[in-house]
Amino acid sequence: MNQLIISAATEGAAEANPLVPNVWEMGVVLVGFAVLMYIVVKFVVPMFEKTFAERAEAIEGGIAKAEAAQAEASAALEEYKQQLTDARAEANRIREEARAEGAQILADLKAKAAAESARITEQAHAAIESERQAAVVSLRSEVGTLATTLAGRIVGEALTDDQRAARVVDRFLADLETQSAGAAK
């Protein structure tokens, strides 16, 4: 049997090289490859191209949408910043108006209080002066009566004459006023 294997190997070795393929096999493989390439180029590649184009378009559309959204967000941010700046300026203006109005109200109240104080003081001075005049008149009549009575006792005669009594009282009061004026100086 060993002989048989060796002889078969020597016969086949002379006829074909295992590294060089058979021509018919190579032709069949090339025809199969050509058919496969035709199918791939005709059907598969266009589907891949279509899918690739759709995905590229979707990606570019997504990028465009993202850029548009980013631009819109930036515009909204700028608008909000402007509104915030305007609101702060408005708040400052309102605060300054309120401060000025408060100062005006305070000044008005101070002026009213000063006027009221002056009026009350003037009324008090008038009331005091009125009471002083009433007191002076009352005191003159009482002092006159007392002076007449006292003078009558001192002199020893009654001063029943009204004119004489009035002169005595007036002279007494004039002396009293000059003494009080001299003491006040």
Curated annotation (Swiss-Prot):
Keyword Magnesium: no
Keyword DNA-binding belongs to the record: no
Gene3D superfamilies attached to this UniProt entry: F1F0 ATP synthase subunit B, membrane domain
Membrane topology, record value: Single-pass membrane protein
Top-level taxon: Bacteria
Coiled coil region boundaries: none
Keywords: ATP synthesis, Cell membrane, CF(0), Hydrogen ion transport, Ion transport, Membrane, Transmembrane, Transmembrane helix, Transport
Gene Ontology CC: plasma membrane; proton-transporting ATP synthase complex
Membrane-crossing residue ranges in chain numbering: 28-48
GO MF terms held by the record: proton-transporting ATP synthase activity, rotational mechanism; proton-transporting ATPase activity, rotational mechanism
Pfam families noted in UniProt: ATP-synt_B (PF00430)
Subcellular location: Cell membrane
Stored InterPro entries: ATP_synth_B-like_membr_sf, ATP_synth_b/b'su_bac/chlpt, ATP_synth_F0_bsu_bac, ATP_synthase_B_chain
Chain's role: F(1)F(0) ATP synthase produces ATP from ADP in the presence of a proton or sodium gradient. F-type ATPases consist of two structural domains, F(1) containing the extramembraneous catalytic core and F(0) containing the membrane proton channel, linked together by a central stalk and a peripheral stalk. During catalysis, ATP synthesis in the catalytic domain of F(1) is coupled via a rotary mechanism of the central stalk subunits to proton translocation. Component of the F(0) channel, it forms part of the peripheral stalk, linking F(1) to F(0).
Complexes and interactors: F-type ATPases have 2 components, F(1) - the catalytic core - and F(0) - the membrane proton channel. F(1) has five subunits: alpha(3), beta(3), gamma(1), delta(1), epsilon(1). F(0) has three main subunits: a(1), b(2) and c(10-14). The alpha and beta chains form an alternating ring which encloses part of the gamma chain. F(1) is attached to F(0) by a central stalk formed by the gamma and epsilon chains, while a peripheral stalk is formed by the delta and b chains.
Family: Belongs to the ATPase B chain family.
Protein's recorded name: ATP synthase subunit b
Organism: Paenarthrobacter aurescens (strain TC1)
